[in-house]
Amino acid sequence: MKNYSKKNSVLIIKFGGLGDFILSVEPFYSIRQHHKNENLILLTEKFYSEIAQKTGWFEKIITINRSLFYLSDKRQIKKKINLSDIKKVYDLQTSRRSSSYFNLFNEDNIEWSG
C-alpha cells in the first residue's frame, strides 16, 4: 500500500459476497489506471481488506461493520473518512444501502458514479 497524503482522493465503495468482490478486481485496476495521480481509498468490510491490500492499488482501506440500520453505517463513514479529501466516489456496490451514502458526499459537491 502506498503512502497516503492529503490531496484529491477517489473513494471506491465495495461490499457484497466474496465472488462479487473478486469480480471487482478488474474495475479496481481500471480505476487505478484512470486515477494514477490521485489517492484511492476503498470502503469495504474487514473480510476483504487483506485481499485489497495485496493488490497495492489503494493508498487507504477503510472498513466498516455494516449494520441493519443505514444511519449507523453513515456515522462510521463520517467518522473514518475526511469528506473534504474526496473528489469522486465510485459506488461499485450500487445497492440501496450504498446509494443512501450519496447524501453524505453530496454536501461537498463530490462527483458520484454508480
Put a short name on every predicted segment.
Residues 1-114:
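Catalytic machinery of carbohydrate-active enzymes
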